[in-house]
Swiss-Prot record:
Function: Catalyzes a reversible aldol reaction between acetaldehyde and D-glyceraldehyde 3-phosphate to generate 2-deoxy-D-ribose 5-phosphate.
Gene name, Swiss-Prot/TrEMBL: deoC
InterPro entries recorded: Aldolase_TIM, DeoC, DeoC/FbaB/LacD_aldolase, DeoC_typeI
Pathway: Carbohydrate degradation; 2-deoxy-D-ribose 1-phosphate degradation; D-glyceraldehyde 3-phosphate and acetaldehyde from 2-deoxy-alpha-D-ribose 1-phosphate: step 2/2
Protein family: Belongs to the DeoC/FbaB aldolase family. DeoC type 1 subfamily.
Active site as annotated: D89 (proton donor/acceptor), K151 (schiff-base intermediate with acetaldehyde), K180 (proton donor/acceptor)
Pfam families reported in the protein's UniProt record: DeoC (PF01791)
Location within or outside the cell: Cytoplasm
Enzymatic class: lyase
GO molecular function, one term: deoxyribose-phosphate aldolase activity
Provenance organism: Streptococcus suis (strain 98HAH33)
Gene Ontology CC: cytoplasm
Protein name stated in the entry: Deoxyribose-phosphate aldolase
Length: 220
């Protein structure tokens, strides 16, 4: 198992500086992570920095509330891709989901999938705000809309990924859709627990610490 290729090396805090982004980019190249996940304003910088590497550029859309309209999310997606984004992590319309307005939730995700072309789309369901039934419904709608992944969390709400949520999401979507655990993996042990529960990608700001733990254990 190549643990490094499970990791989306992430820096999304609003106060992030260019120097901090450049540090994350250098680390991502050193460890050959799956991707770097940055806010849209840093996508062009990341794309230029990573152009000669295998590391993908991931960004966030409708972030962190998910409460923009489908048209705005679609525009954000196209803009991000034009700047060099390879992967799109979009926040679901959480309020519409909890209201039971599933048509809007579906339209919202479909708008981003359509705007993304052949780029990878991960749908952030913000599991900490949902009941288990709502988590299942969010995963089903994401699958129906043609997204590639479901993702647990933004990291900006009341909690991050849990092993139980990852397991439920994997059970719901089956083997043919990705599951990303985000906002909860701070150590090698955390990462392995999420992978064993069904995660195919891990979003973490502590990717280097996770890998250093893996090196200490000699198993990655």
């Amino acid at each position: 198992m190549k643990l490094n290729k499970y990791i989306d090396h992430t820096i999304l805090k609003p106060e992030t500086t260019q120097e901090q982004v450049e540090k994350i980019l250098a680390e991502a190249k050193e460890y050959d992570f799956a991707s770097v996940c940055v806010n849209p304003t840093w996508v062009a910088l990341a794309a230029e920095s990573l152009k000669d590497s295998d590391v993908k550029v991931c960004t966030v859309i409708g972030f962190p509330l998910g409460a923009n309209t489908p048209a705005v999310k679609a525009f954000e997606t196209k803009d991000a891709i034009s700047n060099g984004a390879d992967e799109i992590d979009v926040v679901i319309n959480i309020g519409a989901l909890k209201t039971g307005n599933y048509d809007l939730v579906l339209e919202d995700i479909k708008a981003v999938v359509a705007a993304s072309g052949d780029k990878l789309v991960k749908v952030i369901i913000e599991a900490c705000l949902l009941t288990d039934d709502e988590k299942v419904k969010a995963c089903q709608l994401s699958q129906e809309a043609g997204a590639d992944y479901v993702k647990t969390s933004t990291g900006f709400s009341t909690g991050g990924a849990t092993v139980a949520d990852v397991a439920l999401m994997r059970k719901t979507v089956g083997p043919d859709m990705g599951v990303k655990a985000s906002g909860g993996a701070r150590s090698y042990e955390d990462a392995i627990a999420f992978i064993e529960a069904g995660a195919s990608r891990i979003g973490a700001s502590s990717g280097v610490a996770i890998m250093n733990g893996a090196q200490a254990d000699g198993d990655y």
